[in-house]
Curated annotation (Swiss-Prot):
InterPro entries: Ribosomal_uS2, Ribosomal_uS2_bac/mit/plastid, Ribosomal_uS2_CS, Ribosomal_uS2_flav_dom_sf. Residues 248-258 have a biased composition (Basic residues). This is Small ribosomal subunit protein uS2. GO terms for molecular function: structural constituent of ribosome. Residues 238-266 are annotated as: Disordered. Gene3D superfamilies: Glucose-6-phosphate isomerase like protein, domain 1 (3.40.50.10490), Helix hairpin bin (1.10.287.610).
Amino acid sequence: MPQVTMRQMLEAGVHFGHQTRYRHPKMSPNIFGARGKIHIINLEKTVPLFNDAMNFLSAVAQKRGSVLFVGTKRSARDAIKEEAERCGMPYMIQRWLGGTLTNFRTVKQSVARLKELELAETDGTFSKLVKHEVLRLRRESGKLQASLGGIKDMNRIPDAIFVIDIGHEDIAIKEAKKLGIPVVAVVDTNYDPSLVDYPIPGNDDAIRAVQLYARAAADAVLEGKAAMPNAVAVREEEFASAPDAGKKGRQAQPKKGKRASDAAAE
């Protein structure tokens, strides 16, 4: 599991919450106090919850599951994209398209169209078209890439989603809950932590804090992948031992045309 210390959280500003007037009652147990009009999050509560969330993501990856990284707010886009790509997981950094999860079949059709356009540009198809048609198709491809590029290799519903801001990504969370997909999410002082399965009390606005969360989530996924059962090695070991087993089996057989008793006497 990726080790993130309380000092690292302090340096990243994880402990700074929202203004006190926006406090959600269910976040009260995770609030240490207030500085001026800003709530201070109790990192002694955050650390164990953070560790639980990272352990869960690692377990999902270890079972060959997929985690969808979601961060469509401006302060989260770069970190989410970079870390999701680093650990080989799908991501959504532009506006969440309604039905991305609940109407996945239709989304896959749009993804197929994106791949078709990408292939057409590389295989010489565009060179056979008139200029204005090429421009139109490139605009279409650009729009699809912006909205679906991060999930174009996601061939099925994810096994979990990792979210930076549950208020900003409320539609994604509703869709995940409807389908029974576990949600790991950073929850600031102005939101209800009971809306997600693995809440991480923390600042959901500061870029350094977002980078810390995303990097830790990617590290957890990579650790899970590294701990996957190596099925290939097991099969190779079985294959290597197979000839010996076969040899013993052949030795046990009597020679053709002889009775078993004669073979035993020899």
